[in-house]
């Protein structure tokens, strides 16, 4: 019978953590100061915004047109349903 991957007899190399990477007693890492954490947060925001694929002007125009057209259709649909339900309520309740 073969041993399963990561069994106790043969530990994986990735399970070993170098001494410099180990956490302190209790499993918590040292806290950074509030300004350091804020700077890291903003750095991460900038890094994520650089990954965004922004639309071209033509794409933006076409997407905006589609959204406005769809919203206009939905407004008309809700208006027709409201008008119909209003007349149905007047018919039922007098």
Curated annotation (Swiss-Prot):
The alphabetized UniProt keywords are:
Cell membrane, Membrane, Protein transport, Translocation, Transmembrane, Transmembrane helix, Transport
PROSITE patterns on file: SECE_SEC61G (PS01067)
- Specify whether Zinc is a keyword of the entry: no
A GO biological-process term: protein secretion
> Coiled coil located at which positions?
none
InterPro entries linked: SecE_bac, SecE_sf, Translocase_SecE/Sec61-g
Transmembrane segments annotated in the record for this chain: 59-81
Task: Tell me the domain of life.
Answer: Bacteria
Keyword Flavoprotein assigned to the entry: answer is no
Chain intervals with Basic residues compositional bias? 22-32
Q: Which GO terms describe its molecular function?
A: protein transmembrane transporter activity
Location(s), subcellular: Cell membrane
Where is this chain primarily localised? membrane
Membrane topology is: Single-pass membrane protein
For this record, an example GO cellular component is: plasma membrane
Return the annotated region ranges for Disordered. Answer: 1-32
Give the protein's function: Essential subunit of the Sec protein translocation channel SecYEG. Clamps together the 2 halves of SecY. May contact the channel plug during translocation.
The record's subunit annotation is: Component of the Sec protein translocase complex. Heterotrimer consisting of SecY, SecE and SecG subunits. The heterotrimers can form oligomers, although 1 heterotrimer is thought to be able to translocate proteins. Interacts with the ribosome. Interacts with SecDF, and other proteins may be involved. Interacts with SecA.
The record's comment on protein family reads:
Belongs to the SecE/SEC61-gamma family.
Supply the name of the protein.
Protein translocase subunit SecE
Q: Which gene encodes it?
A: secE
């Amino acid at each position: 019978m073969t041993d399963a991957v990561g069994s106790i007899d043969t530990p994986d190399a990735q399970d070993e953590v170098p001494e410099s990477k180990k956490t302190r007693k209790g499993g918590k890492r040292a806290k950074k100061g509030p300004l350091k954490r804020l700077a890291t947060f903003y750095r991460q925001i900038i890094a994520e915004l650089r990954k965004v694929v922004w639309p071209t002007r033509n794409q933006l125009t076409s997407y905006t047109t589609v959204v406005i057209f769809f919203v206009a259709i939905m407004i008309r649909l809700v208006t027709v349903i409201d008008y119909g339900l209003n007349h149905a309520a007047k018919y039922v309740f007098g």
